[in-house]
Design a protein with these regions (language model features):
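Positively charged n-region of N-terminal signal peptides that target proteins for export
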Residues: 1-4
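Bacterial N-terminal signal peptides
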Residues: 7-15
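Electrostatic cytochrome c docking/interface patches
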Residues: 18-41, 79
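Sequence/structural segment immediately N-terminal to covalent heme-attachment motifs in c-type
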Residues: 31-55, 87
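Sequence context surrounding c-type heme c attachment/ligation sites in exported
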Residues: 36-44, 119-127, 141-142
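Short cysteine/histidine-rich zinc-coordinating motifs and their immediately flanking basic loops
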Residues: 59-63
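Extracytoplasmic electron-transfer domains, predominantly the class I c-type cytochrome c fold
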Residues: 65-121, 132, 136
Length: 142
């Protein structure tokens, strides 16, 4: 009887441990914003990491493996011209493809997320990314 209880306790502990290791992670749906408002999209999707003023110090920045860049300095770091195509590609494809030296893929790949707002149609998502890029371009330090 004593051995049966011991075996039961061991199996119970193994089952609990095994169950804890099979945690399922569900994605959170993206919040709908105006497709036309780059500012609204920035505040909803970018400010947590890049900061309210796009300087890189958002409340979630400390959780990132690589510190989010100051988005107001992109033009200054590119000879005075906002790197629109590169910025757009980073939003569309993520940093692993566009900036391999970036390190980890902390930043989401926004194309599929934004496409999900329009029944997975890519066209409206591309327009959203264009408007977001135009907004960030308007934030460049003079």
């Amino acid at each position: 009887m004593r051995n049966s209880i011991l075996v039961f306790v061991i199996l119970l502990a193994a089952g609990i441990t095994g169950a804890a290791q099979n945690v399922e992670i569900h994605s959170v749906p993206i919040k709908r914003t105006s497709w036309a408002s780059g500012q609204q999209m920035y505040q909803e999707y970018c400010a947590a990491c890049h900061g309210e003023n796009a300087t890189g110090g958002g409340p979630a920045a400390s959780a990132c493996t690589v510190r989010p860049p100051n988005l107001t300095r992109l033009a200054a770091q590119n000879g005075g011209k906002f790197p629109f195509n590169h910025f757009y590609a980073v939003i569309q494809f993520g940093t692993q493809l566009t900036t391999p030296a970036h390190g980890t893929a902390d930043m989401p790949i926004w194309l599929p997320l934004l496409s999900s707002l329009n029944q997975d149609r890519e066209g409206p998502a591309l327009q959203r990314m264009h408007n977001l890029a135009r907004y960030v371009a308007s934030l460049q330090a003079q």
